[in-house]
Amino acid sequence: MQKVTVLCVGKLKEKFYMDAAAEYAKRLSRFCKLELVELPEERLPEDPSPAQIEAALLKESAAILAKLPSGAALIALCVEGELRSSEALARRMDAWASQGMGQLAFLIGGSFGL
């Protein structure tokens, strides 16, 4: 069974989202071993400078690398990225599994990206 880790910078705060994440984890448990890892988002002032943002991103990237499962294929998710249907993603995950990628890590960045 494929192991899937979702690394996200920032925490789920609203009960609706926490409940939805739990429901998806339950539904996916038949197909993969799912782990959700929430990493703290670096605190920044209200109007951060580019240097402050860069420093925060470096700290967040260190936290991501520390939690990234060894040997996992890393897939960064982005709002500007390619939209895939559930079926297309399932086919892609099957292809990765066939290629020996038994462990996947999906990454969701914080407010200022990755």
Task: Give residue ranges: language-model regions.
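S-adenosyl-L-methionine/SAH cofactor-binding core of RNA-modifying enzymes
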Residues: P40-L104
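N-terminal beta1-alpha1 ligand-phosphate binding loop
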Residues: M1-L28
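Short glycine-rich anion-binding loops that position phosphate/pyrophosphate groups of nucleotides
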Residues: L12, V79-E82, G110-G113
